[in-house]
């Protein structure tokens, strides 16, 4: 299965409240700002941009689905402060498990460990996540640290070691502070809870340079049975396909066969986390782990072609896209989210590649930060995407402002276009770029953020 990529660590930055609103243009998503109970003193929650569909947002994050508990505690892994830095998501039963991982050749020890576990086991019981040290480029000792951590969690939960998955985020080249981690595990396991607070504390514990935590839970009905999907993610910098700098944990109480579940996760990742970019860096640690408890009561989904599978896939896509957009919205130093929508391509893959090319362009990102409607940079990034199309069929719009039609530039009010960009930045809202390359049936989206002076400052001082 072809997977993703993930991230790094930074000492906590005091959170500056970010007002959020959608631009006046109607968008197919609902904006919900989540609260983070007892953890809000450390970090607030990201806005959730949930696509419209036959589902509703519910409380609970990764604990919303039946059978799941979570916890996040401070264990001394971070350089300073008492922000939670160790999280655990556990299932009461053997859950069908799937994963997607970084494409970076220098994959971190926990990534290598998880890939090995998933190659030999179809089920999982828990995911342990630490922040502070990435445990990447740490050799054999780093890998043993991951094994020892999994073994310790397994003993406390009274399950097999190969049912424990590990994720790490932090500074590359640093092994985990294993003694502090192992000493904290009894307290972490004792803190496991199916409450909203349990989910929120875990979502905060996995953050690094993030200014907001990312957590969501959705309920839908399939075959007359209520199904829940929950998720949490982290990521703010070192984000670029494949699988942008990020960690993610997904939970559901649907019953899905192993092969179908793994293919569903692969498809959803390709439409979400692989479609976000902040800075063009593919992390060593990117990892998404997804667990299905099967406790909802719905008969198992055994085929991708069934109506139930298609309904479930759409909801899974929506959850992952919501988390992905929250990551891009929270890009290091960003003032706005960029959403690129491409239509008219030959197929979904080609549309997605064009959208990624535009969202990844440093010149496009810098122009948006400068509130400069320099649409030529958009056209340029479409052209070098590697996808062949008829340039005389190219249409480009910025928000509701048409800039190019059938390959011909259109007159437009630059002050109005600049104000559109400024309003989005002032409100930490969304800049929409719409592109059509023909009359094909392929559609795709990608998400990014603008490129500001603050991004350079954050990363220039990362380990100092």
UniProtKB/Swiss-Prot annotation:
Enumerate the residues marked as the site Cleavage. Answer: 244-245
Q: Does the record's keyword annotation contain Ion transport?
A: no
UniProt site (Involved in the stabilization of negative charge on the oxyanion by the formation of the oxyanion hole): 169-170
Catalytic residues (UniProt): 245 (nucleophile)
> Mainly resides where?
plastid
Write out the entry's keywords from A to Z.
Answer: Acyltransferase, Amino-acid biosynthesis, Arginine biosynthesis, Autocatalytic cleavage, Chloroplast, Multifunctional enzyme, Plastid, Transferase
List of residues binding substrate: 208, 234, 245, 332, 459, 464
Extract one GO cellular component term from the record. Answer: chloroplast
- Name any one GO molecular function: L-glutamate N-acetyltransferase activity
Instruction: Name a biological process GO annotation.
Output: ornithine biosynthetic process
The EC number(s) attached to this protein equal 2.3.1.35, 2.3.1.1
Pathway it belongs to?
Amino-acid biosynthesis; L-arginine biosynthesis; L-ornithine and N-acetyl-L-glutamate from L-glutamate and N(2)-acetyl-L-ornithine (cyclic): step 1/1; Amino-acid biosynthesis; L-arginine biosynthesis; N(2)-acetyl-L-ornithine from L-glutamate: step 1/4
Catalytic reaction equation(s): N(2)-acetyl-L-ornithine + L-glutamate = N-acetyl-L-glutamate + L-ornithine; L-glutamate + acetyl-CoA = N-acetyl-L-glutamate + CoA + H(+)
**Record localization:** Plastid, Chloroplast
Q: What does this protein do?
A: Catalyzes two activities which are involved in the cyclic version of arginine biosynthesis: the synthesis of acetylglutamate from glutamate and acetyl-CoA, and of ornithine by transacetylation between acetylornithine and glutamate.
- Share any extra remarks: This protein may be expected to contain an N-terminal transit peptide but none has been predicted.
The entry's family comment says:
Belongs to the ArgJ family.
HAMAP family (alphabetical):
ArgJ
Question: What is annotated about its quaternary structure and interactions?
Answer: Heterodimer of an alpha and a beta chain.
Give the protein name, as stated in the record. Answer: Arginine biosynthesis bifunctional protein ArgJ, chloroplastic
Q: Which organism's genome codes for this protein?
A: Zea mays
Q: Where is the organism placed in the taxonomic lineage, from the top?
A: Eukaryota, Viridiplantae, Streptophyta, Embryophyta, Tracheophyta
């Amino acid at each position: 299965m072809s997977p993703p990529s993930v991230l790094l660590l930074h000492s906590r930055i005091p959170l500056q409240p970010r007002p959020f609103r959608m631009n006046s243009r109607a968008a197919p998503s609902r904006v919900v700002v989540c609260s983070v109970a007892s953890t809000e003193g450390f970090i607030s929650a990201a806005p959730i941009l949930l696509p419209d569909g036959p589902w509703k947002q519910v409380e609970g994050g990764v604990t919303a689905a039946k059978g799941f508990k979570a916890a996040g505690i401070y264990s001394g892994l971070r350089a300073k402060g008492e922000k939670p830095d160790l999280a655990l998501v556990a299932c009461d039963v053997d859950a069908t498990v799937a994963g997607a991982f970084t494409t970076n050749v220098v994959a971190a020890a926990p990534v290598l460990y998880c890939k090995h576990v998933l190659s030999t086991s179809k089920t999982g019981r828990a995911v342990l996540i630490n922040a502070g040290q990435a445990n990447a480029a740490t050799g054999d000792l780093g890998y043993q640290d991951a094994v020892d951590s999994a073994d310790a969690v397994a003993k406390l939960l009274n399950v097999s070691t190969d049912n424990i998955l590990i994720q790490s985020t932090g500074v590359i080249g640093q092994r985990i502070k294993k003694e502090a981690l192992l000493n904290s595990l009894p307290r972490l396991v004792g803190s496991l809870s199916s409450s909203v607070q349990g989910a929120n504390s875990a979502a905060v514990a996995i953050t690094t340079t993030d200014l907001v935590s990312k957590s969501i839970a959705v309920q839908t009905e399939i075959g007359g049975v209520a199904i829940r999907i929950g998720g949490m993610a982290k990521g703010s910098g070192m984000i670029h396909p494949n699988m942008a700098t990020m960690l993610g944990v997904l939970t559901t109480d649907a019953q899905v066969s192993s092969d179908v579940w793994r293919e569903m996760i692969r498809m959803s990742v390709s439409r979400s986390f692989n479609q976000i970019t902040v800075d063009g860096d593919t992390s060593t640690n990117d990892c998404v782990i997804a667990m299905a408890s099967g406790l909802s009561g719905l008969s198992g989904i055994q085929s991708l072609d069934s109506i139930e599978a298609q309904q479930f896939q759409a909801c899974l896509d929506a959850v992952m896209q919501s988390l992905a957009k929250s990551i891009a919205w929270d890009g290091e130093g960003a003032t706005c989210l960029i959403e690129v929508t491409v239509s008219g391509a030959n197929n979904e893959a080609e549309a997605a590649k064009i959208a990624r090319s535009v969202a990844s362009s440093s010149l496009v990102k810098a122009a948006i930060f400068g509130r400069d409607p320099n649409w030529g940079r958009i056209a340029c990034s479409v052209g070098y995407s590697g996808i062949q199309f008829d340039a005389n069929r190219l249409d480009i719009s910025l928000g509701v402002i048409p800039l190019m039609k059938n390959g011909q530039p259109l007159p437009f009010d630059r002050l109005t276009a600049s104000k559109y960009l400024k309003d989005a930045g002032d409100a930490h809202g969304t800049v929409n770029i719409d592109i059509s390359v023909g009359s094909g049936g392929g559609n795709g989206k990608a998400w990014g953020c603008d490129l500001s002076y603050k991004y350079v400052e954050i990363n220039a001082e990362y380990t100092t």
